[in-house]
Structures are given as C-alpha cells and as structure tokens.
Amino acid sequence: MSQVKLQPKKKYGHIDGCVRCGRKRGIVRKYGLHLCRQCFRETARQLGFEKYS
C-alpha cells in the first residue's frame, strides 16, 4: 500500500501577528506588509518608503 503524505491546512484570513517579531498589536496590513508599527518604522527605508516631513 502506498504512503499518503498529508499536507497542513492552508490558513485563510488575517495573519496572527508581525512576521518579523510576532507582536500582536499595531499591525500594518496595508500593501500586504503584516508588520507591527515598530518594525515598520525600523525597516521602512529598506522597503522603499520615504519620509517627506
């Protein structure tokens, strides 16, 4: 009998937290970033965002 490998269920909907640090509050979901606001501030320049003021 052949072995059947089961794959984990795919999650749909919101991601549970920041993909960088795991923090649950202050998530920036716009443009599919899924970063908390602190991680967003640290990595915004590298992501291509510019501060105008």
UniProtKB/Swiss-Prot annotation:
PROSITE patterns: RIBOSOMAL_S14 (PS00527). One of its GO terms (molecular function) is zinc ion binding. Keywords: Metal-binding, Ribonucleoprotein, Ribosomal protein, RNA-binding, rRNA-binding, Zinc. Zn(2+) binds at C18, C21, C36, C39. It comes from the Archaea. The keyword Zinc applies. GO terms for cellular component: cytosolic small ribosomal subunit. Its cofactor is Zn(2+). Binds 1 zinc ion per subunit. One of its GO terms (biological process) is cytoplasmic translation. Belongs to the universal ribosomal protein uS14 family. Zinc-binding uS14 subfamily. Part of the 30S ribosomal subunit. Binds 16S rRNA, required for the assembly of 30S particles. This is Small ribosomal subunit protein uS14. It comes from Thermoplasma volcanium (strain ATCC 51530 / DSM 4299 / JCM 9571 / NBRC 15438 / GSS1). The lineage of its organism: Archaea, Methanobacteriati, Thermoplasmatota, Thermoplasmata, Thermoplasmatales.
